[in-house]
């Protein structure tokens, strides 16, 4: 089985799974999600992704009838059921099912729906540089929550596709926030600089791994706002996410960027890919 689906205890092919029309995720995007990647049927950084998922459940007043340990065991069991060990593992919880009304359903504090989807996807190749465009950040101020309400990110990602590039980096009130579905950081003068984790960006697991790698490798790091002009002038621009461990950017808005500190970037990238391969190797 390749494309595996799960919904409230039911398991089958994604294409054959059924979700009730009254699921509040369909009406309002009233829910949260997370995603990770597996290799050799081992999910990378699973504990970190689950911790973020439960933090977001709490922020949205959602109660999932499952402990973090139980969710982890479920995800690992589902990954072991698929043919290919390299999988994109996606899961979401919504505020239950009820006829459409904005307020919570009467049982909305204890009847969350859980959906899981698995399909064969590899992480981005380390030798594949990225091209970006930029656009104003039109999202609202819940960007630190991995909510299902992703319309602005969908539109930005589509703009990137139509421009023939990989991602769209967004900016708000003069400062860089993040890309449509990944974090963006930079190297300047040997220092790793990444936006702070406030309401404007998602606290990415990949971003956290970059900061940890910097500390291990002795690379100075700063968490602070920076502008698009600073980004264009960076020695290296770095994109990161669950599926993009550490990728260099070579073009921004049609102009060449980066390529000025390959040594420091290479250390970071090698460290992160070594960690990926080590923690997902066959036992």
Q: Positions of the model-derived regions?
A:
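Feature marks short, surface-exposed loop/turn motifs that line or immediately flank catalytic pockets
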Residues: 97
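Helix-start/capping segments and mature chain N-termini
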Residues: 1-77, 94, 104-283
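Ordered, amphipathic secondary-structure segments that act as subunit-interaction surfaces
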Residues: 75, 80-93
């Amino acid at each position: 089985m390749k494309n595996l689906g799960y919904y409230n205890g039911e398991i089958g092919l994604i294409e054959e799974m059924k979700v009730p029309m009254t699921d509040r995720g369909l009406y309002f995007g009233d829910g949260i999600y997370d995603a990770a990647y597996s290799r050799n049927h081992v999910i990378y950084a699973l504990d970190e992704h689950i911790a973020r998922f439960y933090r977001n459940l709490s922020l949205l007043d959602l109660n999932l009838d499952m402990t973090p340990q139980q969710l982890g065991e479920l995800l690992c069991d589902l990954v072991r059921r698929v043919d290919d060990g390299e999988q994109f593992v996606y899961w979401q919880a919504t505020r239950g099912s009820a006829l459409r009304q904005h307020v919570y359903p009467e049982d909305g504090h204890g009847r969350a729906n859980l959906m899981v989807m698995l399909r064969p996807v590899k992480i981005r190749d380390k030798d594949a540089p990225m091209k970006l465009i930029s656009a104003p950040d039109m999202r609202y101020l819940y960007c630190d929550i991995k909510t299902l309400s992703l319309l602005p990110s969908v539109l930005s990602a589509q703009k990137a596709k139509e421009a023939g590039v990989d991602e769209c980096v967004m900016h708000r009130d003069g400062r860089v926030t993040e890309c449509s579905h990944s974090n963006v950081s930079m190297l300047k003068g040997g220092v790793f600089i990444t936006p702070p984790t406030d309401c404007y960006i998602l606290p990415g697991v990949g971003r956290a791994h970059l900061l940890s790698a910097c500390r291990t490798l002795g690379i100075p790091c700063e968490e602070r706002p920076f502008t698009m002009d600073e980004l264009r002038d960076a020695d290296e621009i770095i994109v990161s996410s669950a599926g993009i461990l550490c990728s260099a950017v070579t073009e921004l808005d049609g102009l060449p960027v980066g390529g000025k500190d390959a040594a420091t970037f290479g250390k970071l990238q090698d460290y992160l890919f070594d960690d990926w391969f080590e923690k997902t190797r066959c036992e």
